[in-house]
Amino acid sequence: VALTATADRLTRKDIALQLRLCDPAVFIASFDRPNIRLVVRPGQKRFEQITDFLRRRPGQAGIIYCLARRTCEELAQRLNARGLRAAFYHADLPPEERSRVQDDFLYDRVPVICATVAFGMGINKSNVRFVIHYNMPQSIENYYQEIGRCGRDGLPAEALLFYSYGDVKAYREMFQKEEGCPPERAALKITKLERMYSFARSPVCRRKTVLAYFGETYDRRCGQCDICLNPPEYFDGTVIAQKALSALKRTQERVGANLLIDILRGSSRRDIMERGFHRIKTYGAGREYSFAEWSDWLSQLLHLGLLEIAYDEHHHLRITPEGYKVLFEGKPVMLAASLRSAEKPLARKKMPAERTAGELDRREALFQRLRELRRTIAVQEGVPPYVIFHDSTLQEMADRQPLSVADMLRISGVGERKWERYGMLFLLEIQQFVSGDSAENAGP
């Protein structure tokens, strides 16, 4: 018998392979923890949000997970300075100190622990009322495992997640420094990290998204996550979903998201022609929609559980059983209109005389950050910086400060090819700059 607490399809397959199991019987319990309310927020002013959260729950036991050991210590110190009793825990503490902190938490002498992710794995404390992620976890599996340490008594509990692109950058740097990690393993980690970041920014019900990730169908909205309590505008996206699923089916599910979008939009890129995808019936069936719209909708189909990523097969998209119900049985699909509502004309670019000194300073600071990002990418790829983006394009980014995919694609010099290759890196850099997230992510 092989047992595991949390495993997606790929992990289950790998377990069977490693243990040399031949056609094993697999029993999967539900991943649903209905007593845990899932809330996700951007990382701006997270310390103030956490102090407010704790003051509204005096005496309740909870864990605050941090990426860095230093952050654990500093966050606990700042909370204590605000009159909120907290301790910190990480691997650098002496064994006797770790044991003391664990006992203080178990016996309710300290209600809040600021810790790295190892804390809680061997602790049987049923009345943990909340888990806060000060930094975003590196995958949805990790997220699910860590929030599962609250509400074990079945009573209401809350999981509060803060996210930022600074977390993504920190994990990427950490993965790159790992010694002996095969390239394919590193690529898988990065893909799962990006999936986690996509989850944090998704307009789809949190519970539905998490359960879909593990292959479990949840045909309703939970009614208590941050998305359900403040829902976006929805529209009937059944035909859009059917076009995407049909096109994927006709490629024999041998493409990733970007290539699928280009097929739907009737692109004449070389690999489409060479592989004969221009001959399939759904080639160009979605040419009336932009690349950005299709990118947003495919992400939603993924979080709705209609698509999945075959991590072990070149990260190609696959249609799930629920996806086939949409394709062949006409099961309706409601999509969030988040991108459509964001597609408003960008603010008129001010002439230099109209800008304040502060605005000019900020735009220049952003321009220099974008130039530094461009230089880093150019060095990695061994190409001149202008091949990435011209200075004029970076200047327009700094002036207009686009915050959505749709806005970014309206910047002169950001075509679909450039977007596909470099766009998200620059968009996330701009988002981080505008939110003032750098300082927030550096410490508590």
Identify the meaning behind each predicted range.
Residues 17, 80, 145, 201, ...:
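Short polybasic/polar patches that bind polyanions
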Residues 1-184, 188-191, 215-220, 226-227:
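Helicase motor core with emphasis on the C-terminal RecA-like subdomain
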Residues 133, 199, 396-397:
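Short alpha-helical segment immediately N-terminal to, or the first helix within
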Residues 14, 49-52, 195, 209, ...:
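Alpha-helical scaffold segments in soluble metabolic enzymes
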Residues 14, 49, 74, 100, ...:
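Short, solvent-exposed alpha-helical surface patches in well-structured domains
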Residues 184-214:
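Short, charged low-complexity linear segments at domain edges
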Residues 188-190, 208, 217-444:
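Accessory DNA-binding and partner-docking regions appended to nucleic-acid-acting proteins
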